[in-house]
Every structure is written in C-alpha cells, then in structure tokens.
Amino acid sequence: MDDIMYLVTGATGIIGRPLVEALLSEGVEVRAVTRSPEAAAFPAGVEAVAPEAIRSALRGVHALFVHPRAAKDDTDELMRLAAEAGVPKLVVMSAINVDDDLDHQPSRCNGDRNAEVERAVIDSGLPWVAVRPTSFAMNTLGMWRGQLTFGDTVRGPYGGFAEAVIHERDVAELIARALLDDSLLGRKIAITGPEALRLDAMVPILGAAIGRPLHFQEVPPEMAAQGMIRNGLDERFVHTLLARYHRELNRPATVTTEIESILGHPARTFATWCADHATAWA
C-alpha cells in the first residue's frame, strides 16, 4: 500500500490529527490540508499542503476526507475539483443530529454546516461514506473548564440529561476505516460512546480521573446560561444547547454499537477520555 495516498482536510483539528496518525499506522501515505503547513508539525512522511493548493493535492489520491468546518462554504468547489480529479471515494463527517431541524442543531451557532456539507458529498456523484458522530467528550473542556478553575463544582441545569459522548480517537479510527474499506460505501454511520451518562454523573467521573472531588450542582437554566456566556460561549449556542437539553431530557439517549462492530473493539468510555486528557484540566 506504499503508493496509496489519502487526502485529509481539517488535518490539524480535534479529528484531523488522530486521523492522520490512524492512517499512518496502516502504512499508507497522507497528504494533509492545513492553513499553516509550515507550522503543522505533522509526523515524518506526511505531506502538508495549503488549501490554495487543493487542486493539485487531489491528484492521485485514493480517497478524500471532507471535514465540514474545513469545507464549509467551499464544499461545492471542492466536490467539483474532486470529480475533475477522479477521486475514487469521499468520506464526510457530519453529526448524529444532522437530520434534525436546523434550529435544533447547536453547533450551527458556531459555524458548522454539517447538513449542507454531507448533502453536497452525497450528491457529488462520487462514491461516499458519511460518518455521524454524537457529541464529543472533548466538548466538556469548553463547557466546564472555566468553572473548575475556581472550584470543584460544575453548575448547570438539566443534570438528568444523558448522552453517550464519544472519544475523538474512536471517531478518527472509524473515519480511517471508512477511507480504507470499500465495504462501508454508501452508508450513513451513526457512532456514539459505549454508554449514555447523565451530566450529573459525568462530573464525578472526571473528578476521579483528575484526583479532585468534583460534583454537579443543579441551577436554573437562566442562571446557567449567564455563567456559560460569561465563560466565553456564544450566546446563541448556549440557548440552543440548553433548549436541546430541555427537549431531550426525558428521551432515551441514542447508543450505537457501530464502533465495536466495525473496528472490532468497544468504544472508549468517558472515564478513558478523562484519563487521556487529565492534564488539560490542570
């Protein structure tokens, strides 16, 4: 497989870096798109290219990973260039809630265009796979770290809201498999962590990993929203997220087994994610 090249967009992000590593571990060559190739610090053997060079970067690749934030407003042009280059396969990452009403997708407030990018890939006329992860465990950093700088309490509403957050490495490894394995073509693959956890249960799990007696304190939604906004979160995002928590509070959380069935190992737990990122909370 030494001559097989894979092109990764969004290559320096939360998913991009572990995806590059996962592909390298399979012995294939990787071409990685990043806005700052000279500062990307990829492992040896990775060819870093700027977005402006995407036309030439597409030549000769076996498959292309389309990151929704990297593609975004340029998706149609990227699809045109991929078709022009005869790219044999596209793998796109969207989200598990991509079919929900757009007003019910909090990440859109931060600029995500999962629905539009996934649709452009599916409509491109090229073979495709769509990977639809649930919320990343990594999101807890942005949600809780500000509060935990000043104490051991996470204050928030809807402590009974549960979801099966996913480790970014599981997402990256699933995408790598989709790039490498043609048996997944034409599938929309929803992936989650191994178990649904309530917010008020996740906080003490994090505490056990970092050696602190953390706990969750229920507060009214209005008070929580004000605190989240003070900690730097976008106001529209906060209100859309809390509306989602309220709307889904009493619904069974979605838990899939696709990670285990496709990759052959169980999805990593939230406790594992916390241990892997313990230093980020210092």
Where is each model-derived feature located?
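Rossmann-fold cofactor-recognition segment
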Residues: 44-54
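A hydrophobic C-terminal alpha-helical subdomain
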Residues: 222-282
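Basic/polar N-terminal segments that are highly enriched at the extreme N-terminus
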Residues: 1-5, 279-282
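Short, acidic/turn-prone active-site loops that include or flank metal/cofactor-
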Residues: 52-54, 95-97, 159, 243
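Residue-level recognition of oxygen-bearing side chains
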Residues: 53-56, 272
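Oxidoreductase cofactor-interface core, primarily capturing Rossmann-like NAD(P)-dependent enzymes
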Residues: 2-43, 59-62, 68-89, 96-215, ...
